[in-house]
A protein has these predicted regions:
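N-terminal signal peptide c-region/cleavage motif recognized by signal peptidases
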Residues: 17-18
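Histidine-rich, glycine-flanked metal-binding segment
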Residues: 32, 37-83
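C-terminal cap of metal-dependent C-N hydrolases
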Residues: 44, 382-384, 388, 401-438
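Metal-associated gating/positioning segment near the N- to mid-region
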Residues: 80-155, 171-175, 240, 264, ...
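Active-site gating loops and adjacent loop-to-helix segments of metal-dependent hydrolytic enzymes
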Residues: 94-115, 171-190, 225-238, 295-330
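Histidine/acidic-residue-rich catalytic or RNA/ligand-binding cores of hydrolases
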Residues: 97-101, 144, 173, 227-229, ...
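His/Asp/Glu-enriched, well-ordered alpha-helical/loop segment
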Residues: 105-107, 251, 255, 320-321, ...
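Histidine/acidic residue-rich metal-binding segments in metalloenzymes
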Residues: 146, 201-298, 327-347
Length: 438
């Protein structure tokens, strides 16, 4: 039997056997980068049933050969470059960094309901930019968990979300939600707090988040730029606390992502066994050795570094405690990324959007390329590597039969010019075509 005839016969049998309400989508791809790092393919047809890629075949299949299907959509991308949906491993979809007075107003006068509404808007911006999967690493209460579930059910358009819930911090540390608040404004309910002191509390904080349904654990191993305290950016958890967190998370099947700027905190977190370091600003040769030895990932967030560097130049945008840290740390992140990448550290794409405008995630590609990463490796970082870090490489990261239908298209070849990733013109997220706003 000829290959094309066999393909059509197989397709028809799949459609006949599929559930009555199955959605069938046929996509013609002019150029297909199905597995970043491998040679592009030309004139390909992708068949999707519901949210799963059923087949990818050479040539443009005539839509008429699909047969009679109640819910059928044909997508012509024969003039486009088609890729796997992108993955951002560091986002905050339910918030955004604003000038200090507005940020404080929101902290004291708005509720989690406001954050939920913001999350719906920001999720749509993110998926329209071609990011069909994100790790959401830090958000108030259960807001991001609810957003994840509503996206999964198809009620809200947005990316597939892997959610950490509130980050775990030491008292007074980077993610202590009561920092800079008057005692009378501090929340009373323990569920609103993100602090843990000592190995026992650290283990309990991990278990409590897993009870709430998180997909991973986020910790703040060091101080942070945007916490409104003059506590620096060095190590904040003790080594035994870090070890307790990682051990408790592993026992329940969760990975740990560690926010870390200072060298001592980066290295302590890596020795404890975290899966990723977020930011990694002051990494050193020992850090690089530990990254490679532990097969850990750096999530660079250059996007956020550029944002805080720029805003630190505006009088009054940040309170004094933040302004000084932003001016010092922001300019260093891109260079730290460059050194890590050159040394062979695993890189997983991540922006820290929320620090910077939602929907601008692809700007990170430009910054990574400026720092010496090839266009091909940029794409690998946001697909294959990111999927491996999340632990979802059997579902996302490449376009292959049996994987999720997360598919995007851009107007020109990103291997020649990575800036084309700023101009996504088509998105399917988990089998759903996303109408674009522009």
């Amino acid at each position: 039997m000829r290959p094309l005839t066999l393909f059509i016969a197989t397709t028809l049998s799949l459609l006949i056997c599929a559930p009555t309400l199955a959605k069938t989508t046929l996509i013609h791809c002019g150029t297909l980068i199905d597995v970043p790092g491998q040679a592009p393919k030309h004139n390909q047809s992708i068949l999707v049933i519901d949210n799963i890629i059923v087949s990818i075949t050479d040539g443009f299949i005539d839509p008429g050969t699909i047969g009679t299907v109640d819910d059928f959509e044909f997508v012509d991308l024969s003039d486009s470059f088609v890729l796997p949906g992108l993955i951002d491993c560091h986002t905050h979809l339910t918030g955004e960094i604003l000038p200090s007075h507005e940020r404080m107003r929101r902290r004291t006068q708005e509720s989690e309901a406001h954050a939920a509404i913001d999350g719906v808007v920001n999720a749509k911006k993110t998926v329209e930019a071609g990011f069909t999967t994100v790790r959401n690493v830090g958000s108030p209460g259960s807001v991001a968990l609810a957003l994840r579930d509503r996206i999964n059910s198809g009620i809200v358009p947005g990316p597939r979300m892997f959610v950490s819930g509130p980050a775990v911090s030491v008292t007074g540390g980077h993610a202590d939600s009561t920092n800079a608040l008057s005692p009378i404004l501090r929340p009373d309910l323990p569920s609103h707090l993100s602090t843990a002191d000592g190995p026992s509390e650290a283990r309990k904080a991990v278990r409590a988040r897993i009870r709430e349904g998180v997909d991973l654990i986020k910790i703040t191993a060091t101080g942070g730029v945007l916490s409104p305290t003059a506590a620096g950016v060095d190590q904040q958890f003790f080594d035994d606390e870090l070890e307790s967190i990682v051990q408790a998370a592993r026992m329940m099947g969760r990975k740990v992502a560690a926010h870390a700027h200072g060298t001592d905190g980066i290295n302590a977190a890596l020795r404890a066994g975290v899966s990723s370091i977020e930011h990694g600003t002051y990494l050193d040769e020992e850090s690089i050795r530990l990254f490679i030895e532990n097969d850990a990932y750096l999530v660079p967030t250059i996007h956020a570094g550029k944002f805080v560097e720029d805003k630190a130049k505006i009088d009054g945008y940040f309170p004094d405690a933040i302004q000084k840290k932003a001016a010092e740390v922001g300019p260093l992140i891109q260079d730290s990324f460059a050194r890590a990448h050159k040394a062979g550290v695993n890189i997983a794409f991540g922006t820290d959007v929320g620090v910077g405008a939602h929907g601008t995630n692809a700007q990170e590609f430009i910054y990574m390329h400026e720092a010496g990463m090839s266009n091909e490796d940029c794409l690998i970082s946001a697909t294959i590597n990111a999927a491996k870090l999340i632990g979802a490489e059997n579902q996302i990261g490449t376009l292959e039969p049996g994987k999720s239908a997360d598919i995007i298209a851009v107007p020109s070849n990103p291997l020649d010019d990575i800036s084309t990733m700023l101009h996504v013109q088509f998105v399917i997220a988990n089998g759903r075509v996303i109408p674009l706003s522009q």
